[in-house]
Amino acid sequence: INPGAILLRAAWMYDFPGDRLPIRGNLPLNLLSAAKTGTALHFSEHDFRGVSYVREVIDKLIPAMELPGGVYNFGSGNDCDMFETVSRFARLLGVEVPLEKDHWERNLAMSGEKLKDFGIQFDSTIQAFQQCLDDYGFGHF
């Protein structure tokens, strides 16, 4: 094992299609699709994870290459469960999505405190999504 190796633990990421690059399903696109089709989405109030704007992740990759060897959580933190997160994303998008509560448990929450010690800090999940909307000219719906 190389003690100088840097391992970045990434969160679920999203972006909107652009620059002729393929975008696979991600949270905002899943919400827009569900709003269009009326398909219910299922999320749990016992599921905790960050969801990161891929452009913010990319912007922080170069500084991350200067980190000392170790394992780092690399993405947005989140102070809400996924049901609340999805509800907030839908409100920011200005869409109504049929959401159903599931009850399974998962905790993939990440703390960025270790990164902060080295001057790298991510926006919260909700702040980053608002930035994404601003970057694409959607602003506040």
PLM region spans:
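NAD(P)-dependent short-chain dehydrogenase/reductase
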Residues: I1-R49, E56
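Hydrophobic/aromatic beta-strand patches that form the interior of the parallel beta-sheet core
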Residues: I6-L8, Y72, D123
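Residues at secondary-structure transition points
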Residues: P22, N26, S52, E105-R106, ...
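Structural element of the ATP-grasp superfamily
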Residues: L31, K114-L115
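Residue-level signal for the nucleotide or nucleotide-sugar donor/cofactor binding architecture
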Residues: R49-S52, C80, M110, I120-D123
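Mid/C-terminal beta-alpha module of Rossmann-like enzyme folds, strongest
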Residues: I58-R106, S111-G112, F141
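Residues within well-ordered alpha-helical secondary structure of globular protein domains
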Residues: P63, R91, Q121, D134-D135
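Amphipathic terminal alpha-helices
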Residues: T125-F141
